[in-house]
Amino acid sequence: MATPVMIWFDPMCPWAWITSRWLLEVQRVRDIDISWQVMSLAILNEGRPIPPEYADAMANAWKPVRVVIAAEHDHGASVVAPLYTALGERIHLRGRTDYDAIIREALEEVGLPATIAEVGTSTEVDDILRASHERGIGLVGDDVGTPVISVPGPSGEPIAFFGPIMTPAPKGEEAGRLWDGTLLVAGTPGFYELKRSRDAEPQFD
């Protein structure tokens, strides 16, 4: 029986993108069933001081998450993964920042109505977005970011954690071994943190 895995992501986050591609690789070598959930860096950083160089990014961060949550609400959970991939390939692999065009193209690629793009600059789905965000961040605390992953523990209780953060994403059995180790560490009672400073920028492949 496949292990259900929930991942909360923000399409704008390069580290979440890498982790999500790793999970897809894990799915090739381990029996897991991924459920894609939305969280928001814009919500996470509300009320926090934002360095000027990140202000525009935070303002634009609302658009993709609103579009993804609206697409899920109107068309079901099955559209989330392909829409995320279509957005992420443009944002991260191609390095584009023309978000309105990115959203229009991504919606067209996955066969969703172009009108969904309109919610990117409105607040009409924000309650749904905030609820999804809180479900994820409520599992790990608000002093972390995206991605958040949750899996069932031995007794069915959720085991949740931020990350793992890596670059580049491992492939094949290396991806599976990292998954095995992550579950072992995260499932250890009383374990909270294992960290070292990053010395590389996100590497996409």
What do these predicted regions represent?
Residues 1-6:
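Extreme N-terminal starter segment of soluble prokaryotic enzymes
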Residues 8, 17-104, 181-185, 193, ...:
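Structural alpha/beta surface segment adjacent to cysteine/selenocysteine redox centers
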Residues 10-13, 54, 58, 119, ...:
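Charge-dense, low-complexity intrinsically disordered segments
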Residues 13-16, 149:
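The canonical Cys-X-X-Cys-His
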Residues 16-19, 130-132:
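Short amphipathic alpha-helical surface micro-motifs
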Residues 24, 98-205:
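C-terminal cap of thioredoxin/glutaredoxin-like
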